[in-house]
């Protein structure tokens, strides 16, 4: 049996893009800022299944179905459930994650009954700083959705974004709030500036990002997935080994919601060169 550290790979599928009416200052999917991104209504379920099959072939264990918008409604929950059922029927071995905004306990139970394994809802930043990045909904609403996920029996995936102008205390408060939820997995995102967005610059560098990974690892524990997600290529390109040594054990492969990521083959070569194994089963964690 290999003793090499295993890295868990996750792929994201933006199945409804660029239609959100909220005012989150970090998000190109908001219609308020007119960012130059691809915007479209629901993808065909057959396309979602085919993209899931490709993600699995690229080594992904996690496959996240993401929709733009504040939260779930009847139409959205039905579509995500049907997409999940189709993926589960056609592609074996994927941990299906839904990321669809605020959600009630009843909606989350419905998704679980139709094949979703985990629900992603990020706290984004500290409760204190949240009004600086969003006014159309509150931080507490996000926290309550995470509590609903726990109550539903779904695994919780919850993290945040760093580098949006927040203070060091805000970062510590965010990580403490995430830890209080005891999520099974936590994505750490690092802000990717876009000229259309109100937040123009990123106030975080490589060493600070490493410290966030170390602190998250300490607070969350060894038995949780700690994923470096958005912004990885901006801060850790060529320095991925330090990221993993700091405690990260998961990355997103392929593209993000509206920005390009590394080609999956490049990530696989990087992991092989550094001496890590791609995890082949969620049971191994």
Curated annotation (Swiss-Prot):
UniProt-listed PROSITE patterns: RADICAL_SAM (PS51918)
Cofactor(s) recorded in Swiss-Prot or TrEMBL: [4Fe-4S] cluster; [2Fe-2S] cluster
Disulfide-bond pairs as recorded: none
Catalytic activity: (4R,5S)-dethiobiotin + (sulfur carrier)-SH + 2 reduced [2Fe-2S]-[ferredoxin] + 2 S-adenosyl-L-methionine = (sulfur carrier)-H + biotin + 2 5'-deoxyadenosine + 2 L-methionine + 2 oxidized [2Fe-2S]-[ferredoxin]
Limits of the Radical SAM core domain: 2-223
Cofactor notes: Binds 1 [4Fe-4S] cluster. The cluster is coordinated with 3 cysteines and an exchangeable S-adenosyl-L-methionine.
Enzyme class: transferase
SMART domains per the UniProt record, alphabetical: BATS, Elp3
A Pfam family that the UniProt record links to this protein: Radical_SAM
Family: Belongs to the radical SAM superfamily. Biotin synthase family.
Subunit structure: Homodimer.
Function: Catalyzes the conversion of dethiobiotin (DTB) to biotin by the insertion of a sulfur atom into dethiobiotin via a radical-based mechanism.
Designated name of the protein: Biotin synthase
